């Protein structure tokens, strides 16, 4: 209890200290900061965009929790579509946003046995390697090509969310040899029903091959990959929904780290973009959790689908030089 109180009190203080430190450093090096933001594509006073991003990401954090989607999948298309930043910098910040959420959630999920380390490690090895390749491809391609591909991907994600029907505890009658050899099985306790569920996987090889594509897309677009991890783990491989969600969140802390290093190494992560975005999403998530009990998930879900369709279409048109 004391630990939870300390965490709740300490996180806002730490976030405020980070923001103050970033703004103080920026004020001392104003010409360099203005030049850096200019390279990112921003115009106007240097302090305006971090404040706008902070407020925007606060709203985004609330919506992400209520809709049950990762912040990264909303952050990249919306910020690239409605802010004057270059896409490379948006993708770098998007990976940092997804990574921050995953690192915060990972230890708790492992402790509650909602994330399976045996399931995550083989998947993470494939996805993180491919995320590095995806990041290198994304930075090498012309911006308009990446915008077109991003728009098409966001439209696909919106359709996937609309059509997907996850199964709480899929029935796996015949686990395959690869899943058994890799130890992809376990037991988790469902607190809501008070029952223990034993689970195992099937169609393991096709599932692992899917993570090659997921890893490349995560690195190329800076989206994180929770939107794709859960359907593959749950619907294709037969992992219970709660374990799939928990393992997916833990996976992001490994997959996004490898891709984020590429963007950091190329100078595509600007603290004045990344830190306000992370802090805004963090505070928004706290508010979203409190509103979750009162919200109507169906309405929020359709609202997010609508936002993604609009953002995907805007990115597609921007890449084609129309919007």
Give names to the regions the model predicted.
Residues 75-89, 211, 219, 228-243:
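Interfacial segments of multi-pass membrane proteins
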Residues 63-73, 218-226:
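Short helix-coil transition sites and intra-membrane helix breaks within transmembrane domains
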Residues 76-77, 103-114, 198, 217-219, ...:
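Generic transmembrane alpha-helix signature in multi-pass membrane proteins
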Residues 100-106, 279-284:
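Central cavity-lining transmembrane alpha-helices of secondary-active solute carriers
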Residues 91, 245-249:
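Small-residue hotspots at the loop-to-helix junctions and early N-terminal turns
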Residues 68, 105, 131, 259, ...:
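Conserved kink/hinge residues within transmembrane alpha-helices of Major Facilitator Superfamily
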Residues 1-60, 81, 87, 111-215, ...:
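Juxtamembrane transmembrane-helix boundary motif
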Residues 60-64, 214-219, 255, 259, ...:
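Hydrophobic transmembrane alpha-helices of secondary-active solute transporters
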């Amino acid at each position: 209890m004391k630990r939870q109180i300390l965490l709740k009190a300490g996180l806002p203080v730490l976030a405020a200290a980070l923001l103050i430190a970033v703004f103080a450093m920026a004020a001392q090096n104003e010409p360099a900061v203005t030049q850096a933001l200019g390279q990112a594509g921003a115009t106007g006073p240097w302090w305006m965009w971090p404040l706008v991003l902070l407020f925007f990401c606060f709203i985004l954090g609330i919506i992400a929790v209520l809709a049950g989607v990762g912040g990264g999948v909303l952050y990249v298309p919306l910020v690239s579509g409605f802010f004057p930043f270059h896409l490379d910098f948006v993708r770098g910040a998007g990976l940092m946003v997804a990574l921050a959420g995953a690192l915060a959630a990972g230890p708790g999920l492992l402790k509650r046995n909602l994330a399976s380390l045996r399931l995550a490690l083989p998947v993470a090895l494939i996805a993180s390697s491919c995320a590095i390749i995806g990041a290198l491809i994304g930075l090498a391609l012309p911006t308009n090509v990446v915008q077109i591909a991003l728009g098409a991907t966001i439209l696909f994600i919106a359709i996937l969310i609309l059509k997907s029907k996850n199964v709480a505890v899929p029935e796996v009658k015949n686990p395959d040899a690869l899943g058994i050899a890799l130890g992809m099985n376990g037991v988790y306790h469902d607190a809501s029903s008070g029952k223990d569920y034993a689970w195992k996987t099937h169609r393991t090889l096709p599932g692992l091959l899917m993570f090659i594509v997921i890893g490349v897309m995560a690195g190329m677009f800076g989206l994180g990959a929770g939107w794709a991890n859960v359907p593959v783990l749950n619907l294709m491989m037969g992992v219970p929904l709660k374990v799939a969600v928990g393992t997916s969140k833990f996976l992001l802390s490994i997959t996004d780290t490898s891709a984020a290093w590429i963007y950091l190494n190329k100078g595509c992560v600007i603290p004045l973009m990344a830190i306000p975005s992370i802090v805004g999403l963090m505070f928004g998530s706290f508010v979203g959790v409190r509103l979750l009990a009162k919200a109507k998930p169906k309405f929020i879900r359709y609202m997010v689908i609508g936002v993604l369709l609009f953002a995907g279409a805007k990115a597609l048109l921007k890449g084609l030089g129309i919007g």
